[in-house]
Amino acid sequence: GGSSRHEKSLGLLTTKFVSLLQEAQDGVLDLKAAADTLAVRQKRRIYDITNVLEGIDLIEKKSKNSIQWKGVGAGCNTKEVIDRLRCLKAEIEDLELKERELDQQKLWLQQSIKNVMEDSINNRFSYVTHEDICSCFNGDTLLAIQAPSGTQLEVPIPEMGQNGQKKYQINLKSHSGPIHVLLINKESNSSKPVVFPVPPPDDLTQPSSQSSTSVTPPKSTMAAQNLPEQHVSERSQNFQQTPATEISSGSISGDIIDELMSSDVFPLLRLSPTPADDYNFNLDDNEGVCDLFDVQILNY
């Protein structure tokens, strides 16, 4: 049968050609003789090799059909060349040492990740629960923010509202992805945190029907509901869901919503415009996401 594809490859031919070149007297090789020795019918394949070797300054043309390996030419064994060769070898050794160090560091990191992910004791410390957060900020209103890297956060100086209370704002701006905000609320040490997204879904602001099961949480300045399961997996991957008071979809207390909506500072704002209103499309560099919408309560 014919020769294999590997035997005809240019890479294998180059290896054989360089071997001939290194064995040639004074490093001078006749290309016609090389083509006959290597049984190459198409001489252009030989020229393809010599063009590359000449381009990287390993050979030079002596005549039309002969080339010379520069490693054996005059001046190739000067002190300058030898010193340069030693420097290059030292650089290679240094790079190989650094590569081994990086490989070792990589193995340590992989083992550390494995210890955290698979060890039963360490596993419970790989996430933060709603209970953990609430215990650190007892009595405060908690907003958990999940935003992509590079998100800009701005907290303007609080302004006094019409009722004499300060109005606080947080402006978040991201150019690389969506920003998700969760309101986490806990009434007392005995109660469990309740969580829902900000702004709340439409069904949270709807009065609950008589057929739905509802639980009225204690009145406070903040109300909350368990985040639906799909939102927990998609929107709050960094926050472990904790069991909370079971509240079916759309069953948050109407009294709590009415109380919040009637207050001077309603903490949850629906930014989607009504069919009759349009968005404000232009933003200056000093404006945040709140300025994109005509939200009067934030513009006092």
Curated annotation (Swiss-Prot):
Low complexity: bias regions: 203-221
Main location: nucleus
Function of the protein: Transcriptional activator that binds to E2F sites, these sites are present in the promoter of many genes whose products are involved in cell proliferation. May mediate growth factor-initiated signal transduction. It is likely involved in the early responses of resting cells to growth factor stimulation. Specifically required for multiciliate cell differentiation: together with MCIDAS and E2F5, binds and activate genes required for centriole biogenesis.
Cell compartments where the protein resides: Nucleus
Chain positions covered by the region annotation Leucine-zipper: 31-53
InterPro entries noted in UniProt: E2F, E2F-DP_heterodim, E2F_CC-MB, E2F_WHTH_DNA-bd_dom, WH-like_DNA-bd_sf, WH_DNA-bd_sf
UniProt DNA-binding region: 2-73
Source species, domain of life: Eukaryota
CDD domains to which the protein is assigned, alphabetical: E2F_DD (cd14660)
Record-given protein name: Transcription factor E2F5
Tissue distribution of the protein: Found in placenta followed by kidney, lung and brain.
Keyword Transcription regulation: yes
Motif DEF box mapped to chain: 36-73
Gene Ontology MF terms: DNA-binding transcription activator activity; DNA-binding transcription factor activity; DNA-binding transcription factor activity, RNA polymerase II-specific; protein dimerization activity; RNA polymerase II cis-regulatory region sequence-specific DNA binding; sequence-specific DNA binding
Transactivation as annotated region, ranges: 242-300
Renumbered residue ranges of the record's region RBL2 association: 277-294
Pfam families tied to this protein: E2F_CC-MB (PF16421), E2F_TDP (PF02319)
Stretches for region Dimerization: 74-170
One GO process term, biological-process aspect: cell projection organization
GO cellular component, one term: nucleus
